[in-house]
């Protein structure tokens, strides 16, 4: 079997500024920080099921990542003609291939229940980058920037080293009744490097734990008994450590699969509440609430009926 797709990996879009009171000599001034861009990937997946061992499936994903991102830091003197404003700009372009492997084993029992065990592994990835660095000064003329001088310009090559990761999981299902699942993941972010620099005091290995369950009271009963009720919990130690404090995350979710047709079409609704970070050591904790809606169709499209 074969499958493909195009998905975003990351998106950067921010602007932040810090203004200072007006000074009698230099006037007002402020620092401005900005960034934009993103990385996308094209995926091609292949799966194979050996004829001599049909309970096992093997998969390979080949991914091509590409994109660019830009960030800048500006010191601005908008009210003074005697002081030059300055800006530092960084432009990065990336292009690289990445591969990951997966296996799945499924055992069906005589009563119709099924046990599924899966594992995946993402290889470490070397990403070459094209880097542009520019530092220049400018002044304002009626709020229009006029470039005065290029202080420094560099065009170099570098690299990003993405770490290996793997995950394992299992699920047990009783068809049209219930399903429970557990999975564990690990990513070696302590080995991440950007332009040859590692960040051992900030980045650490990340462990994730997830558990979930789905229950259908009676698919032949009334409407509320046909609803799929879902519950899940997730926890990750986090890849960041700030001020010697781990930035972990925990969340719980509740969902419903609402049937709207006999063929199996559903409207899926979920609600997730979680916490990320901590208030210890003068840090910030984020409490978030997510709501999602999706639609799954299992109707027979493009089916030509014999009788109208």
Explain the meaning of each model-derived region.
Residues 1-308:
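Subset of outer-membrane beta-barrel
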């Amino acid at each position: 079997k074969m499958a493909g797709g195009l998905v975003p990996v990351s998106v950067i879009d921010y602007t932040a500024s810090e203004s200072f009171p007006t000074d009698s000599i230099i006037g007002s001034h402020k620092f401005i920080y900005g960034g934009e861009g993103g990385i996308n990937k094209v995926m091609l997946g292949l799966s194979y099921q050996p004829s001599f061992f049909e309970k096992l499936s093997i998969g390979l994903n080949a991914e091509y990542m590409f994109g660019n991102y830009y960030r800048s830091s500006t010191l601005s003197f908008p009210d003074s003609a005697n002081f030059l404003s300055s800006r530092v700009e960084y432009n990065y372009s990336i292009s690289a291939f990445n591969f990951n492997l997966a296996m799945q084993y499924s055992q069906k029992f005589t009563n119709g229940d099924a046990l599924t065990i899966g594992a995946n592994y993402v290889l470490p990835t070397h990403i070459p980058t094209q880097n542009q660095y520019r530092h220049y000064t400018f002044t304002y003329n009626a709020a229009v920037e006029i470039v005065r001088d290029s202080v420094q310009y560099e065009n170099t090559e570098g690299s990003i080293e993405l770490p290996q990761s793997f995950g394992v999981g299992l699920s047990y299902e009783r068809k049209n009744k219930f399903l429970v699942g557990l999975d564990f993941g690990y990513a070696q972010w302590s080995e991440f490097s950007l332009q040859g620099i590692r960040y051992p005091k900030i980045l650490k290995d990340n462990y994730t734990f997830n558990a979930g369950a789905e229950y259908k009271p009676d698919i032949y009963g009334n409407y509320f008994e046909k609803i799929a009720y879902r519950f899940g919990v997730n926890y990750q130690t986090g890849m960041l450590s700030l001020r010697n404090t781990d930035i972990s995350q925990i969340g719980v979710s509740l969902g419903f699969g609402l049937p709207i047709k006999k063929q199996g079409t559903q409207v899926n609704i979920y609600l997730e509440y979680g916490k990320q970070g901590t208030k210890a050591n003068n840090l910030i904790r984020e409490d978030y609430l997510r709501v999602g809606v999706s639609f799954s169709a299992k109707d027979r499209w493009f089916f030509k009926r014999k009788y109208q």
